[in-house]
Amino acid sequence: MLLQSLFAWALAIGPCIAQNSTNSTWPIHNNGLTTQVEWDHYSLMVDGQRFFLWSGEFHYWRIPVPELWVDVLQKVKAAGFNTFAIYTHWYFHNPNPNTLDFENAAHNFTKIFDLAKELGMFVVFRPGPYVNAESNAGAFPLWLTTGAYGALRNNDERYTEAWTPFWEKVASIVAPYQFTNGGNVLTYQIENELGSQWRGTPSNKVPNLSSVEYMEALEASARAHGITIPFQANDPNLNSDSWSKDFYDGYGSVDIYGMDSYPACWTCNLTECDSTNGAYKAFNVIDYYDHFEAISPTQPSFLPEFQGGSFNPWGGPEGGCPENSPADFANLFYRNNVGQRVTAMSLYMIYGGTNWGWLAAPVVATSYDYSSPISENRMINDKYAETKLFGHFLRVAKDLTKTDRIGTGKTASTNPNVVYSEIRNPDTNAAFYVTIHKESTVGTREEFYINANTSKGAFKIPQKAASIVLNGFQSKIIVTDFNFGSHSLLYSTAEVLSHSIVDDQDILALWMPTGEAGEFVVTGAKSGSVSSCGGCSSVGFYPQGDDLLVTISQSKGISVLTFDDGLRVLVMDRSFAYEFWVPVLTADPFSPANETVFVQGPSLVRSAAYSSDGSTLDLTGDNNGTSTQIQVFPPKSVSKVTWNGQVITTEKTDYDSLIGSLTGPALDSLTLPTISGWKANDSLPERLPTYDDSWWVAADHMNTSNPTKPETLPVLYIDDYGYHVGNHLWRGRFEGSASGVYLSVTGGRAFGYSAWLNGEFIGSYLGAAYPDTGKLTLSFSNVTVNSNSTNILLVLQDNSGHDETSEALNPRGINNATLISSSTKNFTSWKVTGTAGKPDTAIDPVRGILSEGGLYAERLGWHLPDFDDSEWSSASPSNVSSSAGVTFYRTTVSLAIPTGLDVAISFTLKASPSNAALRVLLFVNGYQYGRFSPWIGNQVEFPVPPGILNYDGDNVIGLSVWRQEEGDESMGVNVGWKVTEAFASSFEPIFDAAYLQPGWTDERLQYA
């Protein structure tokens, strides 16, 4: 559509935007390649069926065990999501310009598409090539960060040549799994938060051709390699107005526009978000409605990334900041988005995972828990449960997919402190009143009524029950003319949870906060009764013409109401709703109500299926505690229920449910063996002048492509020499005397470095949470300087990763190395080493290029299974050497977790003293799964999943301890582990993970 005609059309219909719209008002779009996925002002449409895209993000490369992906995705599905989103990771798959790896272990992500099909979920595929994601250089391959490929994320031919092989291969891999080819991949994102379509003010529409041509090239390449599904984009904020065809049809604009938002800040350091969100106020909602109406009025309002939590930066609070986006955040903000007509939303993150190895950007440490609904250890939490209530509602609220906003900011009757937005389906007249505090940052208890318009007139509701309550940072969606199956609610002040059809009869589930009252009207019902009162009170049935008004108060428990036409209504409080599940019996992402079953009680229900004769309901899932009641609502033909393959004893109730009990493990019954039997060896022989570095790379470049030039020569930027991650070692030589050295070293936030002259320690930069450069003048006064021969300076530096976005080219290495001397300021030569393998190759293709750094222990494979440490001495990391240096500790511990249990295990690292100047790396069966810097803080627990840990077998545990200070003060690290959660589960965490844990080979010896 031409820009001029679009805006003329928009102006013509402008007054309709906040009013009911007829079916013909808004055009239906597709991309011209398929009509299977279409969209309009209201929602996406899949094969003609309107669809609320409810998604959560997870990153397969942050949980590098393919056997665990099904566990995570089953939990996503169980929470009511119909979609999940994934990023790829360019560097993970493209370790050097000549290698693409989509085959080894977790590098092969096609299993995820098979799981999506099996579970009945759509996929939003986000291949980058740049993804940000708090990943090292935003997932750029680090060989790209030298400056030789230009400024990146533009139309530079050098950059284009770099991304083309990866981009083409990804498209060809994904193409067979598209919805248009019988798969479940629904949309394909181009780039990520590239808000640079325009030069200057977006309203002037002056194209930024560098970005425009880049986007156009990415789009054309994806199409040429088989991608036919719609393209989407995610604008980074409310200000850049980039890539919407409604705003401008051309200049690289994509099919479906989206905009990302993190109203409670994407990091625990809240001040970082001030420039985007303004000064932080807890629970301060943001208006998106006007933005989408202006920028993408003929498209669904889409939030490709909406806040699911926050990452924890170096030095952040121990355990992250879940209090910034708790369960109440999910309740309030997700409902408020519905009130703004959002019909496509993906939570970032639904499961965060771990920055194992050197995946992380400098802004974040090892944990990428993100305070997500599914925790880093794969266990679900209260935010998950609250999110599930919302997800189950979305699944059955079909009329939400087409609504107009009738009004917003309306004051509730009798209480000016409560306001609501009214959205209404123009076809069915179903309405949704989304209520919040007038000041969303205020969590006071407020009682109120609303004036609701229904198909049978206007009512001040509730009519008979106690008033509606907002208690705390909460929102409620009050429905009117809510259709489910063959029934309808004229209204309900209790929130709708779910709907199922069993034996051709409707079952409706409602919920309310514990102790509150609700009122609903069942149209066409004549009478009702209480079949089971589990915490109910003040139940009343009041005929109103052809309808029946019902009042009920609900304490902890679940109550069952039965009506004259066979309708059953379950009413439960929040605590019982948290343990209420609606497994789907089909792989249809639309989850039809007649293909679901209600289950209440277990910690998790993963799947449900009926036997071929319909007499048995087979359930799988998780449960804990010594005894858990389970209640199911299956067809009358079901007389037997199995749980994880075992028949459970049940009793049939008068209202046709089956009740039984489950048994599970007591957490205190699981004990882990003590981690002991440590052996140790020196991991820094490079400090010694006798060390042979003849095989190291000569650091002799006198120029660099990097736009940031060094202060001294030669160039000592690590990426220029083919090393990129972890610890790097520089050896500089000089002749004659000097009294000291000035060093300026850059390694990213929280990095550090230490230096030795001729084998003697001269000092360290200990690092801090935010500075990325450390400048020191180190004296040689206490060490021996060879005035008549060669002196060797060793600099061991940490590299916490490359910066993101436009700062990915920021160099890592030594910016300035100047001798303090009357005769010479310069070193005669430099050499460097890092990760084992030739520069820009991966010696360990299974674990991948980001797995390990350049410490002596890593290069020689001391962290790997099968390494022979028989000649090492016994020593404990709890008391490290008094000398500054690096010591590697290693032990083997066997686990024997009982089968039938899913167990979360975390390592605990405790420094002595608590702020010891130590840099510690934790290795488990060859994987680096913890970076512990007690001087900076604050992560002390490190979850390690099965597949990395062998739950039934031996585990090689390694610990690299870099002491940055010398002296008599005792320093050490106490290493422990613990079971944090345990469930009886259908998911089996014991499997053969040998292919994920390749062992030591003598190839490593050449890197000594």
Curated annotation (Swiss-Prot):
Gene3D superfamilies (alphabetical): Beta-galactosidase, domain 2, Beta-galactosidase, domain 3, Galactose-binding domain-like, Glycosidases
Keywords tagged on the record: Carbohydrate metabolism, Disulfide bond, Glycoprotein, Glycosidase, Hydrolase, Polysaccharide degradation, Secreted, Signal
Gene Ontology annotations of biological process type: galactose catabolic process; polysaccharide catabolic process
Keyword Chloroplast set for record: no
GO CC, any one term: extracellular region
Active-site feature positions: 193 (proton donor), 305 (nucleophile)
The keyword Secreted belongs to this UniProt entry's keyword annotation: yes
Gene: lacB
Family: Belongs to the glycosyl hydrolase 35 family.
InterPro entries with a match to the protein in the record: Betagal_dom2, Betagal_dom2_sf, BetaGal_dom3, BetaGal_dom3_sf, BetaGal_jelly_roll_dom, Galactose-bd-like_sf, Gly_Hdrlase_35_cat, Glycoside_Hdrlase_35
PANTHER family from the UniProt entry: BETA-GALACTOSIDASE RELATED
Function: Cleaves beta-linked terminal galactosyl residues from gangliosides, glycoproteins, and glycosaminoglycans.
Recorded superkingdom: Eukaryota
Name of the protein in its database record: Probable beta-galactosidase B
Main localization (coarse): secreted
SS bonds (residue pairs): 268-321
Binding residues for substrate: 87, 132-134, 192, 262, 370
One Pfam family it belongs to: BetaGal_dom3
Signal peptide residues on this chain, from the entry's feature table: 1-18
Residues that carry a glycan: 20, 23, 108, 208, 269, 453, 594, 624, 681, 703, 782, 788, 816, 826, 879
Reaction equations catalysed: Hydrolysis of terminal non-reducing beta-D-galactose residues in beta-D-galactosides
Molecular function via GO: beta-galactosidase activity
EC number: 3.2.1.23
Compartments in which it is found: Secreted
